[in-house]
Amino acid sequence: MKASIIHKLDCLSERHEELQALLGDASVIADQDKFRAYSKEYAQLEEVVATFNRWKKLNSDIEEAELLLDDPDMKEMATEEITQNKAEIECLEQHLQILLLPKDPNDEYNAFLEIRAGTGGDEAGIFAGDLYRMYSRYAESKRWRIEEMSANESEQGGYKEIIVKISGESVYGQLKFESGGHRVQRVPKTESQGRIHTSACTVAVMPELPESEMPEINPADLRIDTYRSSGAGGQHVNTTDSAVRITHLPTGIVVECQDERSQHKNKAKALAVLASRIVQVEQERQAMAQADTRRNLLGTGDRSDKIRTYNYPQGRVTDHRINLTVYRLDEVMNGKIDELIQPIITEYQADQLAALSDQA
């Protein structure tokens, strides 16, 4: 492992010890904000320090074992220990490099998931419903919580557009690579002649930002319209103007919310989604500027970026970003999408490591 990496790990270990002492300090314990910040930093260093300590111990064990190589009675055992430890050290060094990669501060946040039907008419709406079901089942398997923010159902089933909030551990970090164009190839239920059609939906995943990180939105930049809810809501449907539509005039972003019976709650939900979309627009602008310099697995943010195809006749799913194909379409549509998500994350980390090597 490079001396520069070892030096950085030594510094992180020292900081970890310093934080441990600070968290036992009475003045820090009395200051909730400071205690919370130090606790968070301490927790973030736990894994890298523990892994580094294991790496140091294995290297120390190898040095001790090498001293026994001249002893005929101990040579075989020492050689075996050295071989095993070197293999583990190699794995630890790869893991440490990944742990040292720059972290996306948004990864730990909850996420807004937006699915919008694209080309393909009614079939696109049905596919949007299929995608929503897929992500819902995946969220359930992770014990994440799903809360509907806004839904516009299509006539033949499914959705013209649906926005949900998914809450849980590192939701955005797991789902952020799902943003882009999703294409389906199959015989629609409405097709009488058995012809295969191609339809598409766009998926956008945005982090739910804490209030402290939300962009300042000038109220003068907003147009807020209220109207009667057309969705579920029992006796309150179409009796009060509880639904809210907010237009951000500078960007043209429009957010609607009618899920709650309370206009106040719908407005709060819509503003939260709007803030995330405004931040996303800025991130997309930056991504477009960087797109020519290095492959960007997160995409440029362009909703037309085709990232995945679901081919029903062949029972396959293909991720076009890394040329990955799996022939378990039924399982994927039932929420078993880790085998699609994890390879993308791994590839992204490999790209980050390559970028760091280029800079070295």
From Swiss-Prot:
Protein name: Peptide chain release factor 1
Keyword Cytoplasm: yes
Sequence similarity: Belongs to the prokaryotic/mitochondrial release factor family.
Cited function: Peptide chain release factor 1 directs the termination of translation in response to the peptide chain termination codons UAG and UAA.
Superkingdom of origin organism: Bacteria
Keywords: Cytoplasm, Methylation, Protein biosynthesis
Keyword Cytoplasm in record: yes
Residue(s) carrying N5-methylglutamine: Q235
Localization, UniProt: Cytoplasm
Gene3D superfamilies in the cross-refs: 3.30.160.20, 3.30.70.1660, 6.10.140.1950
Primary residence: cytoplasm
GO molecular function: translation release factor activity, codon specific
Post-translational modification: Methylated by PrmC. Methylation increases the termination efficiency of RF1.
One GO CC term on file: cytoplasm
One family name in Pfam for this protein: PCRF
